[in-house]
Design a protein with these regions (language model features):
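Iron-sulfur cluster-binding cysteine motifs and their immediate structural context
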Residues: 3-5, 12, 16-42, 47-67, ...
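Sensory modules in modular signal-transduction proteins
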Residues: 426-459
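Iron-sulfur-associated redox domains of electron-transfer enzymes in respiratory
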Residues: 63-361, 365-367, 371-380, 400-408
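PAS-family sensory/regulatory modules and their coupling/dimerization elements
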Residues: 480-530
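PAS-family sensory/regulatory domains
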Residues: 467-483
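Sensory coupling linkers of modular signal transduction proteins
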Residues: 514-559
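Signal-transducing coiled-coil/dimerization helices and immediately adjacent hinge/linker segments
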Residues: 540-604
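PAS/PAS-like sensory domain cap-loop motif
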Residues: 458-469
Length: 604
């Protein structure tokens, strides 16, 4: 159905929904990219008690809204009626019952009646069946209990009264008056959304919305019921049946005693209690005649879809009881006819027509493949559980035992890393690996500037034991008090501050960071003494190398100068000789010209 939706951004894998789910219908899956665990309701296993919605601390779970469909239904149909659960009195602490009815009329409903009208017929039918039965009869008004029995304890189906819930009975009554009428049930129950889809019940109620949805709808329409005048129901006003949303309400309405000391009747509320009772019923003596079971502790007044501002369970119960006390006054002022609470009397019950209350059930037992012991051991080993004493069975993951969680892992419902003690140990071991395995010294300094802890590398750097340093002031060893105050008071960070520790013959780099949540500072000390020594040695080598290089350069310059001098002398001598030679050659040329005569033409 995709009825329960999960906002993955808000789901913080706290496992509270899983811890609160009696049938463990929560599937833990990893998100595609972040790989973080996220909870998803497996509706094929869910009995729809809705506790996971109410218990989620991040409000990450919600119900698929149905009121838009109801609004559309009203828009095209002028005969849409409300069947209003009697728990409405407890749902809206700031409203009078008549104001709730006025608010509903503002939404466009053609008529409003109390579901409790049909509850009296349902209660009488249960009494009649119980009195004729040889074994205990389980009430069937709570759809979550019906789901529990059909899916997990089907052997109890013969004991489940074949009677529809007051919601279905009331819808059938309303549609008997007008076959084309549409019926919308409004209440605090999640399982009602599913009940109207069960075989044999699909033609009765057209839509279900919760009190939470009703508030949202009012807000969208700009309706403030607290500003409206009281209105009345359109139909009979039941009396005892207004107690139906309380544990023991059905038995009381049936004219039986809900006394806890009676062995004829028994009231069990809370899905855990109901589950335990049904499983252990065979060993019970004596067996009660009629067992009223309600999935919500204390009854429907504590349903998962009650408004958040509807007070505590005790206040809700008291409002229902007060409403019952004031019922005679309501009847006097109400224009609708009064409904006598005589349906449970033997005379009326004997002749009442219960055919329209009949229903059947189906065996929907959840069948899971049970893994072998070897497979279970392999999963347990993933979280370092190799022997029974390693299994803490703490329940932090949501399962009752480590073995139960291992089975869930094999069935695809859980993840090995859901084991909180294992993950804590793993995280601590990784932290210890970083803390104790790093070559740098790490000091944990408190706000009083005293050393709280240190790792073995710090012992090596400071040349003393942990016991000698813990409790002493950090300023005695490594960091000035003024620097620490900057870290604690101004939340500053000191990064790679170089300090000399002459008494230890060390040169270190100091980094100080604040762990504000723990109110401590981490002083990280990196020993760079050997590095600085290497740098000094390298500097010396560089100096010597530069000197040698300069000597070579000087020698090369001297040689070059000598060579240049010699070349200069040789060049000068060569120049003199060549000059003389050129002069001689010139003189010889002039002599040869005079002997041969003048070759130029004579002038005229």
């Amino acid at each position: 159905m995709d009825l329960i939706r999960v906002n993955e951004a808000h789901c913080r894998d706290c496992y509270k929904c899983l811890r609160s789910c009696p049938v463990k219908a929560i599937r833990m899956e990893r998100a595609p990219f972040s790989q973080q665990l996220r909870a998803r309701v497996d509706e094929s296993r869910c009995v729809l008690d809705g506790r996971c919605i109410a218990e989620c601390p991040q409000k990450a779970k919600s119900v698929r809204p149905a009121y838009p469909s109801v609004r559309s239904l009203i828009a095209v149909n002028d005969d849409v009626w409300v069947s209003l659960a009697p728990s409405f009195v407890a749902a809206f602490a700031h409203l009078r019952p008549g104001q709730v009815l006025a608010g509903l009329r503002k939404l466009g409903f053609a008529g409003i009646r109390e579901t409790a009208v049909a509850a009296e017929w349902v209660a009488a039918a249960h009494r009649k069946i119980a009195e004729k039965s040889q074994g205990p009869v389980m009430t069937s008004s709570c759809p979550a209990i019906v789901n529990l029995i059909e899916m997990y304890i089907p052997e109890m189906l013969p004991n489940l009264a074949p009677i529809v819930s007051p919601m279905i009975a009331h819808a059938r009554m309303l549609k008997k008056e007008a076959p084309c009428r549409k019926v919308v049930f409004i209440g605090p129950c999640l399982a009602k959304y599913d009940e109207i889809t069960r075989p044999g019940l699909t033609q009765d109620v057209d839509q279900v919305i919760s009190f939470v949805e009703l508030e949202t709808w009012w807000a969208e329409e700009g309706i403030d019921p607290s500003q409206l005048e009281d209105e009345y129901f359109d139909g009979p006003a039941p009396l005892e049946a207004v107690l139906f949303p309380l544990d023991g309400g059905l038995i009381k309405t049936a004219g039986l005693t809900p006394d806890m000391l009676s062995n004829r009747t028994l009231t069990v509320s809370g899905l855990d209690n109901c589950q335990d009772f049904l499983i252990n019923l065979a060993a019970s003596e004596p067996v009660p005649m009629l067992v009223e079971m309600m999935a919500c502790p204390g009854g429907c007044i504590n349903g998962p879809l009650m408004p958040a501002d509807s007070d505590d369970a005790f206040a809700r119960r008291m409002r229902i009881l007060k409403y019952r006390e004031e019922r005679p006054n309501y009847r006097e002022n109400c224009p609708c006819p009064a409904m006598e609470n005589s349906l449970a009397d033997d005379a009326r019950a004997e002749h009442a027509d219960y055919e329209f209350l009949q229903r059947t059930y189906e065996n929907r037992q959840i069948i899971s493949v049970e893994p072998t012991e070897e497979q279970i051991k392999e999963v347990l080993a993933m979280t370092s559980k190799y022997a029974p004493e390693d299994e803490l069975n703490c329940g932090a993951c949501g399962y009752n035992s480590c073995k139960e969680k291992a089975i869930a892992v094999l069935q695809g419902m859980a993840d090995p890393e859901m084991c909180i003690p294992y993950m804590r140990t793993k995280a601590e071991s990784m932290s210890n690996l970083v803390f104790f395995g790093t070559p740098n010294g790490v000091l944990v300094v408190g706000s009083d500037e005293r050393i709280l802890d240190m790792n073995s590398s710090a012992e090596r750097i400071f040349g003393t034991s942990r016991n000698h340093l813990v409790g002493t002031l950090a300023s005695q060893w490594i960091i000035d008090s003024s620097d620490l105050r900057r870290v604690f008071e101004d939340n500053e960070e000191i990064v790679r501050l170089e300090k000399e520790l002459p008494e230890l013959g060390l040169i270190v780099l100091v980094t100080v960071v604040s762990a504000k949540k723990e109110n401590v500072a981490l002083v990280i000390v990196e020993d760079i003494t050997s590095q600085r020594q290497r740098e000094t040695e390298l500097q010396l080598v560089r100096g010597v190398t530069l000197e040698r290089a300069q000597e070579v350069i000087d020698k090369q310059m001297a040689v070059a100068q000598k060579i240049a001098g010699l070349l200069g002398e040789t060049t000068a001598e060569t120049k003199v000789i060549l000059t003389k030679l050129m002069r001689v050659m010139k003189e010889e040329g002039n002599t040869d010209g005079a002997v041969s005569g003048d070759w130029r033409r004579p002038t005229e």
